[in-house]
Amino acid sequence: PALIPFPRV
């Protein structure tokens, strides 16, 4: 679970 929501495309 990432602490910061990164847009993984």
Swiss-Prot record:
<keyword id="KW-0027">Amidation</keyword>
<keyword id="KW-0527">Neuropeptide</keyword>
<comment type="similarity">
    <text>Belongs to the periviscerokinin family.</text>
</comment>
<dbReference type="GO" id="GO:0007218">
    <property type="term" value="P:neuropeptide signaling pathway"/>
</dbReference>
<protein>
    <recommendedName>
        <fullName>Periviscerokinin</fullName>
    </recommendedName>
</protein>
<keyword id="KW-0964">Secreted</keyword>
<dbReference type="GO" id="GO:0005576">
    <property type="term" value="C:extracellular region"/>
</dbReference>
<feature type="modified residue" description="Valine amide">
    <location>
        <position position="9"/>
    </location>
</feature>
<dbReference type="GO" id="GO:0006940">
    <property type="term" value="P:regulation of smooth muscle contraction"/>
</dbReference>
<comment type="function">
    <text>Mediates visceral muscle contractile activity (myotropic activity).</text>
</comment>
